[in-house]
Swiss-Prot record:
This is 33 kDa chaperonin. It is found in: Cytoplasm. GO terms for biological process: protein refolding. Transmembrane segments: none annotated.
Length: 295
């Protein structure tokens, strides 16, 4: 199934609902960072959550950075997303594999930890970026994105995030949904949705059964879904050698000189995608001649 996100209004237009298939997105992250199962699930849910959140609160050229750190074994997680369906992300410790939890599922809560925060920084292109931060309430991440929306955006919501990792560490499926309660929603409609959410299978199980994002929304709202938009989603990094050269120019000149004299070159590695950029002595000398850093 191709990776794409669906935007809709649903339930007699009392809810705004989003669903995404993002298996390829998470598989690309797993390939680039060589994540093991628990880390794959944690990073994957973070990528899916950011895709859904960005599509629901951003527009135009706006961007966001989601940071999660629960002081668990995977360490900090950072994901960048935009309104156009593009994400990139990484975590500090990709080689984390843990015993399954009591439901025989990957223990994302243990991997992420619960002693920490989820923060979202929104850059609207004008003025200073705005950051909202909430304490982690679960570590499973779906509930944590839900709590963020309620606390920082004042939007009652439900978020479901799911990643299935195969025995060989490859990504089986990944996806999720986000439902926002609109002001005209009745108590009866909200109660009905809550009951549906309780009885609903995991998104990963639905996707393994061949269900599409549209099918998942239909299941939640008994087919009362009006699709407004569909867009492809992808893992994509905008790093470049030129951007790293600019970063080197901001370093103190003596540090760049040491790279020339002692290391005879430098290798820059992008945290987000793992791509490497080599700088020769001559290239570093050119950087030094244009350096903005102090001596």
């Amino acid at each position: 199934m191709a990776d794409y996100l669906v935007k809709s209004v649903a339930g007699n237009e009392m809810f705004r609902a989003y669903a995404v298939s993002a298996t390829g997105v998470v598989a690309e992250a797993q390939r680039r960072h060589d994540t093991w199962s628990a880390a794959s699930a944690a990073l994957g849910r973070s990528l899916v959550g950011t895709l859904l959140l960005a599509s629901s609160v951003l527009k135009g050229e706006e961007q966001m950075t989601v940071k999660i750190n629960g002081n668990g074994p995977v360490g900090g997680i950072v994901v960048d997303g935009n309104a156009k369906g593009t994400v990139k992300g990484y975590l500090q410790h990709p080689h984390v594999h843990l015993p399954l939890n009591d439901k025989h599922k990957i223990d994302v809560k243990a991997a992420v930890g619960t002693d920490g925060f989820l923060s979202v920084t929104k850059d609207q292109g004008v003025g200073d970026p705005f950051t909202g931060t909430v304490a982690l309430v679960s570590g499973e991440l779906g509930e944590d994105f839900t709590y963020y929306l309620a606390q920082s955006e004042q939007i009652p919501s439900a978020v479901g995030l799911s990643v299935f990792v195969n025995d060989d560490n490859s990504i089986g499926v990944a996806g999720g949904f986000l439902v926002q309660v609109l002001p005209n929603a009745t108590d009866e409609a909200i109660s009905s949705l809550e009951n549906k959410l309780k009885d609903m299978p995991l998104v990963s199980q639905l996707m393994r059964d061949g269900k599409s994002p549209e099918d998942i929304l239909d299941l939640l709202f008994d087919g009362d879904v009006k699709v407004l938009d569909k867009m492809p989603v992808k893992f994509e990094c905008d790093c470049s050698k030129e951007r790293f050269a600019e970063a080197l120019m901001a370093l103190p000149k003596h540090e760049v000189q040491a790279m020339i004299d002692e290391d005879h070159g430098a290798t820059a590695v992008c945290h987000f995608c793992g791509d490497q950029y080599q700088f020769s002595e001559r290239e570093l000398e050119a950087v030094l001649s244009r350096s903005k850093g102090d001596a």
